[in-house]
A protein has these predicted regions:
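Terminal, regulation- and interaction-focused segments at domain boundaries
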Residues: 2-33, 131
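Conserved active-site and cofactor/substrate-binding residues in soluble primary-metabolism enzymes
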Residues: 17, 21, 42, 117, ...
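Short glycine-/small-residue-rich flexible loop motifs, especially phosphate/cofactor-binding loops
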Residues: 27, 44-45, 127
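Compact, glycine-rich, soluble single-domain proteins
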Residues: 36-88
Length: 134
């Protein structure tokens, strides 16, 4: 799966799969890495409903790995402000993009060095889930 320019706060890849198949594979990849999908937000539909605007397909998955979330909350009670981990599938210029938040970048703002190993673990799992879409 080809890479796309990823922002400092995320990891993105382009896939040749149709949108719905990419979304299903991302959900399966997240599950394989221990994440459950807590919410699924269809941004295209919501913006059409609320603003009457058209945009390409865009779905956000709010994913949580319960053991890691529990461990993180034990180390940093306010971590809930940064949960769940978001993953996305969207259409851009005729391509389907799949991605996930960079947990290490996100958790760096917490300023708790004890969380760094967990952040790396979460990042590796999210990247494997994204890469599994290929």
């Amino acid at each position: 799966m080809p890479a796309v320019s990823s922002p400092a706060y995320g990891y993105l890849r382009i896939t040749n799969l149709p949108f719905d198949e990419a979304l299903a594979r991302l959900e399966a990849g997240l599950a394989k890495e221990g994440f459950g999908v807590l919410c699924r937000i269809d941004i295209q539909a919501k913006l059409k409903e609320k603003l009457g605007v058209e945009m390409p397909r865009y779905v956000i998955l709010g994913a949580c790995n319960p053991p890691l979330a529990h461990k993180g909350l034990q180390q940093e009670m306010n971590l809930g402000l940064l949960l769940p981990c978001n993953a996305v599938v969207y259409e851009h210029e005729g391509q389907v993009v799949v991605g996930a938040v960079d947990a290490a970048a996100m958790l760096s703002i917490v300023g708790n060095p004890a969380m760094e190993p967990m952040a790396r673990d979460v990042n590796e799992r999210l990247r494997r889930a994204v890469d599994s879409v290929a």
